[in-house]
Amino acid sequence: MSMQSTHPPKPEAPRLPPGIPESPSCQRRHTLPASEFRCLTPEDAVSAFEIEREAFISVLGVCPLDLDEIRHFLTLCPELSLGWFEEGCLVAFIIGSLWDKERLMQESLTLHRSGGHIAHLHVLAVHRAFRQQGRGPILLWRYLHHLGSQPAVRRAALMCEDALVPFYERFSFHAVGPCAITVGSLTFTELHCSLRDHPFLRRNSGC
């Protein structure tokens, strides 16, 4: 698949893992076409940055991606993003890029390696008005399902603060150790998730 596609594939709707309930809005998605999941485009960059800035600045003091970096990734690899829209407005999103090394490093924050097989999840953010509704887990599960439909992507990787490790472990991520990336005085744990062994693939195959 060309990583330069300007018409990224529309993600399929997966089933959620046990213990992660669908929110009321997700349960009604078949009767509410205004609730939509799709890959982002460069035109969504400003909305994404506004959500990201509000979510991260107050907690970490920095954003995972600045506006130019968001535009950069949504131009190069829009198929590695996923947004949740309500009434046409972006309310939650994930942005990723491809990486070609076993572990993340400082360069992976800004680079997209088109020949790589690891999807690096740069940011997951939910608009403040839609938090505490289970949207983060739903979006992440759909995103992993979307990645699993892309043959070139074999694994997902991310870095997070220690307090968030249990959240990602619910989705079959496992910690591989301290991340080589630091942001100021902040340190992170690196987590990986094999998409070839992920539970949704076993269910979809009938196993």
From Swiss-Prot:
Substrate binds at residues 124, 159. cAMP-dependent phosphorylation on both N-terminal Thr-31 and C-terminal Ser-205 regulates AANAT activity by promoting interaction with 14-3-3 proteins. InterPro entries: Acyl_CoA_acyltransferase, GNAT_dom, SNAT-like. Its EC number is 2.3.1.87. Keywords: Acyltransferase, Biological rhythms, Cytoplasm, Melatonin biosynthesis, Phosphoprotein, Transferase. It comes from the Eukaryota. The modification Phosphothreonine is found at residue 31. The record marks 120, 122 as: Important for the catalytic mechanism. One of its GO terms (cellular component) is cytosol. It holds the Pfam family Acetyltransf_1. The keyword Phosphoprotein applies. Residues 35-202 form the N-acetyltransferase domain. It is found in: Cytoplasm. Controls the night/day rhythm of melatonin production in the pineal gland. Catalyzes the N-acetylation of serotonin into N-acetylserotonin, the penultimate step in the synthesis of melatonin. This is Serotonin N-acetyltransferase. It comes from Pan troglodytes (Chimpanzee).
